[in-house]
Amino acid sequence: MMIRDLGKLEFEAALAIQEQLAAGVAAGTSPETLLLLEHPPVYTIGRGGCRENVLDPGIRVVEANRGGDVTFHGPGQLVGYPVIDLGRRGRDLHRYLRILEELLINVAAEFGVAARREPGRTGIWTDGGKLASIGVGVRRWVTMHGFALNVTNELAPFRSINPCGIVACPITSLSAILGRPVPLGDVRRSVAGRFPFLLDERLPFLETAEPAP
């Protein structure tokens, strides 16, 4: 698997990179890739999102071909976009989502934060609120989009929306919980070191896999 650090990149530019990679992965000409980056401030909404969850009519919201509702991305938030060939890994989207949650729970624990799943919801949570959101798109059994882990980012912008479609949803970050800045680079390295091994353990490549339709 290739891991690429894109630094800080506009949402639309990152989407174009994902689409190019996804086409290559589906065709068997590109390796699976984990993109790690930050976005300048931007609100995005998934395919099934409800515009009523945008509480401030003055904000610009970008539509994204992923699951989930409306969320906010900004500097200090680690965004991960794994471009993964689920067609070669058993075509189990539910398990893939649980892997992303497990990854983020383990990363949070490395920094001394206890995070967990919430029944019936996607993402990870703490006693102080939601720590990370997950929204995935799949085309020809190749994944796009992924997760956003709050590290040092401002939390006030989340007040302009119902995050992930949840009314009065408290949002927190690693730094807010710990009461000190958490270096984003350290979190990035933890994610990059853990993800390939966790994915191969939980969703290994099949010896024979159907080609993408």
Swiss-Prot record:
* The reaction(s) this protein catalyses: octanoyl-[ACP] + L-lysyl-[protein] = N(6)-octanoyl-L-lysyl-[protein] + holo-[ACP] + H(+)
**Which residue positions hold the site described Lowers pKa of active site Cys?**
K130
Query: Which leading EC class covers this enzyme?
Result: transferase
Superkingdom of source: Bacteria
Q: Which GO terms describe its biological process?
A: protein modification process
Name the Enzyme Commission number(s) assigned to this protein: 2.3.1.181
Catalytic center residues: C164
Family to which this protein belongs? Belongs to the LipB family.
Its name, as the record gives it, is Octanoyltransferase
Organism from which the protein derives? Geobacter metallireducens (strain ATCC 53774 / DSM 7210 / GS-15)
